[in-house]
């Protein structure tokens, strides 16, 4: 819905995305774009070193495009936690050196909540649990408070969905979160790991990042 609102009725859909990526890559490197009519387009301001272009995705399609275009790949595990290490294995096997990167570069973005105690971290994460259930029902709305999530009457099916998703996140004390992140680095053979923390209270979110920053090696 957001993408449609931004396009304002444009007929350019996701099927054009691969060409858009390659055209942008060409414009940033001052080389001829693929799309006819763009050969006279220029990217400004001009710089000595073009900005790095990365691919963020949550499917095998984006992984394949990143490999073909020679781009570093950031997989949004917080969006699609059902895909495993094979997403990067395929990316590495099919990687073709591009104008800015000669070798593949793998990053995984994971949902995390870090607090002084595991109990507090789990309580903070309940806001996202409820938000996710509402998202599945087609009505995500504003991010709920911890109290709102605690008062919600979950069905047995919803409880199972939450439990399954929680296994794929890094939630707990700084030590527990670091241990979980280390396991992701090993299992996915990562070059980098990126974390995403969303809480109802912005102070708790900031503190989560601070705790993890201090503990992460």
Model-predicted regions and their roles:
Residues 179, 185-217:
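Generic C-terminus detector
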Residues 59-82, 87-88, 92:
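A conserved active-site cap/scaffold subdomain adjacent to cofactor or substrate pockets
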Residues 47-57, 165-174:
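Active-site mouth loops of central-metabolism enzymes
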Residues 79, 112-114, 199:
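Active-site-proximal loop/turn and secondary-structure-junction residues that shape catalytic pockets
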Residues 1-5, 67, 208:
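Short aromatic-enriched loop/helix-cap "lid" or pocket-rim segments at secondary-structure transitions
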Residues 4, 8-42, 83-188:
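An alpha-helical appendage that flanks or caps ligand/catalytic pockets
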Residues 52-56, 73-76, 104-111, 193-195:
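Hydrophobic faces of well-ordered beta-strands that scaffold small-molecule active sites
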């Amino acid at each position: 819905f957001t993408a449609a609102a931004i396009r304002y009725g444009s007929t350019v859909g996701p099927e054009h995305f691969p060409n858009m990526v390659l055209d942008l890559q060409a414009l940033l490197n001052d080389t001829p774009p693929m799309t006819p009519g763009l050969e006279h387009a220029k990217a400004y301001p001009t710089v000595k070193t073009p900005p790095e272009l990365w691919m963020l995705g949550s499917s095998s399609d984006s992984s394949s495009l990143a490999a073909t275009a020679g781009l570093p790949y950031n997989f949004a595990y917080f969006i699609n936690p059902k895909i495993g290490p094979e997403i990067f294995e395929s990316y590495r096997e099919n990687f073709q050196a591009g104008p800015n990167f000669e070798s593949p570069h793998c990053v995984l973005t994971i949902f995390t909540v870090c607090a002084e105690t595991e109990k507090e971290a789990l309580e903070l994460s309940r806001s996202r649990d409820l938000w996710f259930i509402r998202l599945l029902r087609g009505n995500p709305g504003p991010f709920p408070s911890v109290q709102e999530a605690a008062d919600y009457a979950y069905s047995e099916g919803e409880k199972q969905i939450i439990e399954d998703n929680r296994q794929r996140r890094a939630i707990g004390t700084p030590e527990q979160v670091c241990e979980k992140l280390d396991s992701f680095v090993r299992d996915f053979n990562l070059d980098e790991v990126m974390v995403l923390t969303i809480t109802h209270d912005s102070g708790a979110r900031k503190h989560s990042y601070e705790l993890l920053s201090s503990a992460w090696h």
